[in-house]
Design a protein with these regions (language model features):
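Residues within helix-turn-helix
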Residues: 39, 50, 85-88, 99, ...
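Short, Lys/Arg-enriched, Trp-marked, Pro/Gly-tolerant hinge/linker segments that flank
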Residues: 1-26, 30, 39-45, 58-66, ...
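Short hydrophobic/aromatic patch on the recognition helix
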Residues: 51-52, 56, 100-101, 105
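Terminal helix-turn-helix DNA-binding modules in bacterial transcription factors
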Residues: 26, 30, 35, 58-96, ...
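…primarily DNA-binding HTH/wHTH and HhH modules…
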Residues: 103-123
Length: 123
């Protein structure tokens, strides 16, 4: 009986973890264009930020801040490919200033926003 209870607990615990991960990802998807950080996510989830930080990292391999920045860079790339100017899009993508946008974009793409736009506009 104790083995059955342990297995049931593990199944429920796993599904609870998956539910939390999906909720975190959904919340980030809906809010990454504003000044979003782990404190906001934890507050929204009514969970301890250390817990969600460990859970998210163990389930996705990424920290929440990396996930948010990757999503922001993905949006920035799409806007640049659509012909928008880098100076005009950083705020739309959730960055508070151009310097941070530039640094994060370059970190994830190995090129500046302008280089990315130039490279991909010739395709």
């Amino acid at each position: 009986l104790s083995e059955i209870l342990k297995k049931e607990f593990l199944v429920n615990d796993t599904s609870s973890k998956n539910k939390h991960i999906k909720e975190i990802q959904t919340y980030i998807e809906q809010n990454f264009t504003r000044n979003l950080n782990i404190d906001d996510v934890a507050e929204h989830m009514f969970l301890n930020k250390s817990y969600i930080s460990r859970l998210f990292k163990s389930e996705t391999g990424l920290t929440i801040s990396v996930y948010i920045n990757m999503r922001r860079v993905m949006m920035a790339k799409n806007l640049l490919l659509a012909g928008e100017n880098a100076m005009d899009i950083f705020y739309k993508c959730g960055f508070s200033d151009y310097t941070t946008f530039y640094r994060v974009f370059k970190k994830y793409t190995d090129m500046s926003p302008e280089q990315f736009k130039e490279k991909h506009s010739n395709i």
